[in-house]
């Protein structure tokens, strides 16, 4: 159980772990242009299922490609945040929950398909960018999970939280209080 998740999302972790990956692009013809060593859908499923158990939740941050491969992922729950290549109605029979835009799932954690900038008070876990991306960009902390960037390997959300990846991300509440104190001093 990940207790820091907001209430609507806590059920994702009540019976297992939460794994996240993006930009699977199953059977998309342009994958080889993005990365010449793009692996097959079957190879991707094998990597995913090597980590994700039947009791876990799998979150895809968009750009699924051919949806029929999703049924081969052995997770208990499958969640999708739509990407720029995803048609809204195409995945309703393959995912348990589908979201259309960026999603704050905890105080300091934002899931999105495309990177979101200008939010130094949260960790943005996203995909979309098929090049390697530095952890900090434009003052914001990011984890890029485009499949080809992260070795087609999903991350375990609970594990990265325990490892302290968000420990150095300031709280928006703290930032608001600090700014108010600064304003008060200027008066």
Language-model regions, residue ranges each:
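N-terminal active-site segment of His-dependent metallophosphoesterases
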Residues: 1-69, 146-149, 162-163, 174, ...
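Generic structural signal for beta-strand residues in well-ordered domains
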Residues: 11, 51, 71-73, 104, ...
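A general structural motif
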Residues: 15, 55, 75-77, 120-121
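Active-site neighborhood of phospho(di)ester-bond hydrolases with catalytic His/Asp-centered motifs
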Residues: 20-22, 58-63, 79-84, 111-112, ...
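Metal-dependent catalytic neighborhoods of phosphoester/phosphodiester hydrolases
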Residues: 32, 61-76, 82, 87-106, ...
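Short coil/turn linker and secondary-structure boundary residues
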Residues: 39, 82, 152-155
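Conserved beta-sheet core of the metallophosphoesterase superfamily
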Residues: 90-181
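Metal-centered catalytic cores of metalloenzymes
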Residues: 187
């Amino acid at each position: 159980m990940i207790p820091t998740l907001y209430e609507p999302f806590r059920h994702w972790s009540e019976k297992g772990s939460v794994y996240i990956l993006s930009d699977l692009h199953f059977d998309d013809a342009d994958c080889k242009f993005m990365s010449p060593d793009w692996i097959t859908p079957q190879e991707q499923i094998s990597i995913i299922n090597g980590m994700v158990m039947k009791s876990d939740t799998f979150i895809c941050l968009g750009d699924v490609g051919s949806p029929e491969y999703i049924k081969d992922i052995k997770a208990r729950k499958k969640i999708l945040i739509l990407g720029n290549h995803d048609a809204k109605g195409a995945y309703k029979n393959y995912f348990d929950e589908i979201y259309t835009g960026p999603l704050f799932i905890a105080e300091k954690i934002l899931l999105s398909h495309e990177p979101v900038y200008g939010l130094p008070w949260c960790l943005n876990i996203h995909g979309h960018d098929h090049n390697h991306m530095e952890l900090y960009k434009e003052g914001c902390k990011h984890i890029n999970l485009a499949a080809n960037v992260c070795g087609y390997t999903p991350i375990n959300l609970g594990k990265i939280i325990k490892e302290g990846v968000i420990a150095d991300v300031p709280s928006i509440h703290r930032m608001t209080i600090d700014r108010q104190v600064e304003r008060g001093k200027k008066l």
